[in-house]
């Protein structure tokens, strides 16, 4: 297992934070993670979580969890609960109670009135379509709204009537009065408040006007005393507006915004809209489908919090973009599970083996280590006359280099004896349904005298093994860039039809019968697996493949 070639991980924010503390600019660092509760967190959010919580922890500060809940039509308590669970699962805890932008709606409203009284905000009656036309483009300046010069008194009256619910959705908006000719389109009189007659999951029906993200964000940071407001690069052009609001309002603190490059992972989609489409159109079983890029999907697949944190450390934090190879994430989980997952044997495609020269009623309880390096104890495998091996480990006409069982050939059973294939029993269609073999009783734990046995295969006892279901998960998309389709199709056209193969009737060693939900294993010679957190039951386990033993994608 070799580590992927990557530049040394860096974090350009560390020296900034250190300098701010050393200079006395801040006595304590306070960061925040501010998700919008309109979907489940995905692997891209993990980078932001690890960055914000990680910096706070490293420098002895605090990190707030604040829900940016300014768009009630798209938000839901389900998402709030899932986000809290995901952050804690990753190993982080926010300072105090979780916070909501809606906690500050009264203060934000008062600050909007402050801007109106200062002549820096006005109520605009342009429709959304008209407002887009007046806004101009990247190459053309905008045009002032015909409502821009309303008096302070008229604006105060109209804003109060907006708040009172007098007007329908979209009829009016409160806008900041900045500069319609600014080369930065975010400064062309941005919207502060929209009319939305929508029930809010936190405030109920108290409000029918809701603040915009840009008006909410910086002021929420200021209220909470955030010292370093860290967001992704697409908000770099919003920073002048962030600073304009702070400069023109009587806020209690002056946070500073910093931007970093978001995580772009190949073979992966992180657009919430597209993830929701996958769920709604039943291309996957839900937000926690193990093929999804959501944290709940990775968790159900068997990824550990440590592997995701280590992955985020590996890729570092910088301002340069680029696409990260998903092989780095797969390396992180392989490295973790290789070190920490107990070993077990599971036969995915069982073929019965009868050892004809083994005593009829004899059973030997063989002890095998649960881990080759760590002291995890042993598990017991009963060995008797009938066992199962994988059907792929026997070939009547073997290809070149085949080192497993062939007619008349020998192979070692893992932790057990050497057996020889004597006869293949077939059904009427010519399918092999049973092997008759003989064993060498002098080969338990040692090589046979005078001959070399190269192959080692896994096995389970026939009588004591437990039947189980195994789900072989693979990458959901077959293209490294699933968003891009050469023929102009949809990202859905890139779905990998082999991203899930369900195998029923698999046979697992007895120690796996009561595997706990989310318990992780290396199935020897097969890969890393975990017991499904929803469907696996005592005596009827269901295992999800987390990742293969080695990277075989595209080989």
UniProtKB/Swiss-Prot annotation:
L-glutamine binds at residues 68, 213. Its EC number is 6.1.1.18. The keyword Cytoplasm applies. GO terms for cellular component: cytosol. Coiled coil: none annotated. A motif ('HIGH' region) lies at residues 35-45. It catalyses: tRNA(Gln) + L-glutamine + ATP = L-glutaminyl-tRNA(Gln) + AMP + diphosphate. Belongs to the class-I aminoacyl-tRNA synthetase family. Monomer. This is Glutamine--tRNA ligase. It comes from Stutzerimonas stutzeri (strain A1501) (Pseudomonas stutzeri).
């Amino acid at each position: 297992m070799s580590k992927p070639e990557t530049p040394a991980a860096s974090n350009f924010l560390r020296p900034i934070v250190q300098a701010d503390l050393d200079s006395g600019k801040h006595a304590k660092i306070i960061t925040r993670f501010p998700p919008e509760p309109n979907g489940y967190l995905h692997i891209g959010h993990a980078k932001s979580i690890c960055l914000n919580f990680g910096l706070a922890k490293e420098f002895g500060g605090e990190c707030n969890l604040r829900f940016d809940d300014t768009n009630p039509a798209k938000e839901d308590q389900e998402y709030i609960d899932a986000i809290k669970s995901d952050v804690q699962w990753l190993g982080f805890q926010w300072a105090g109670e979780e916070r909501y932008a809606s906690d500050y709606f009264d203060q934000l409203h008062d600050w909007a009135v402050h801007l109106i009284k200062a002549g820096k905000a006005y109520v605009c009656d342009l429709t959304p379509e008209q407002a887009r036309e007046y806004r101009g483009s990247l190459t053309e300046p905008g045009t002032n709204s015909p409502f821009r010069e309303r008096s302070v008194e008229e604006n105060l009256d109209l804003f109060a009537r907006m708040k009172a619910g007098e007007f329908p959705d979209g009829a009016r908006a409160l806008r900041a009065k900045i500069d319609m000719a600014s080369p930065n389109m975010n400064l062309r009189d941005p919207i502060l408040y929209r009319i939305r007659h929508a029930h809010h999951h936190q405030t109920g029906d108290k409000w029918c006007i809701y603040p915009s993200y840009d008006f909410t964000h910086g002021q929420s940071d200021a209220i909470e005393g955030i010292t370093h407001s860290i967001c992704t690069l697409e908000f770099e052009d919003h920073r002048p507006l962030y600073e304009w609001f702070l400069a023109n309002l009587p806020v209690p603190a002056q946070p500073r915004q910093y931007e970093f490059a978001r995580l772009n992972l190949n073979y992966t989609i992180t657009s919430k809209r597209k993830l929701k489409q996958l769920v709604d159109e039943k291309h996957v079983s839900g937000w926690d489908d193990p093929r999804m890029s959501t944290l709940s999907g990775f968790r159900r697949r068997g990824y550990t919090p440590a592997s995701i944190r280590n992955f985020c450390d590996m890729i570092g934090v910088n301002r340069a973009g680029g696409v990260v190879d998903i092989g780095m994430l797969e390396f992180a989980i392989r490295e973790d599970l290789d070190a920490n997952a107990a070993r077990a044997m599971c036969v995915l495609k069982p073929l019965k083996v009868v050892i004809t020269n083994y005593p009829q009623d004899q059973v030997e309880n063989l002890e095998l280590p649960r881990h080759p390096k760590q002291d995890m104890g042993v598990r017991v495998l009963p060995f008797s006359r009938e066992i199962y091996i994988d059907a792929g480990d026997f070939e009547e006409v073997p290809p070149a280099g085949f080192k497993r069982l062939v007619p008349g050939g020998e192979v070692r059973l893992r932790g057990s004896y050497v057996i020889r294939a004597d006869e293949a029993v077939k059904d009427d269609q010519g399918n092999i349904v049973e092997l008759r073999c003989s064993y060498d009783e002098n080969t338990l734990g040692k090589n046979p005298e005078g001959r070399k046995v190269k192959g080692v295969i896994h096995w389970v006892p026939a009588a004591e093994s437990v039947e189980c279901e195994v789900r072989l998960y693979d990458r959901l998309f077959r293209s490294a860039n699933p968003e891009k389709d050469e023929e102009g199709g949809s990202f859905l056209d890139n779905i990998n039809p082999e991203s899930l193969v369900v195998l029923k009737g698999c046979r697992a060693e007895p120690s796996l019968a009561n595997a706990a939900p989310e318990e992780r294993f290396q199935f020897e010679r097969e890969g890393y697996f975990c017991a499904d957190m929803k469907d696996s039951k005592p005596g009827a386990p269901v295992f999800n493949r987390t990742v293969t033993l080695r990277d075989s994608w595209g080989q």
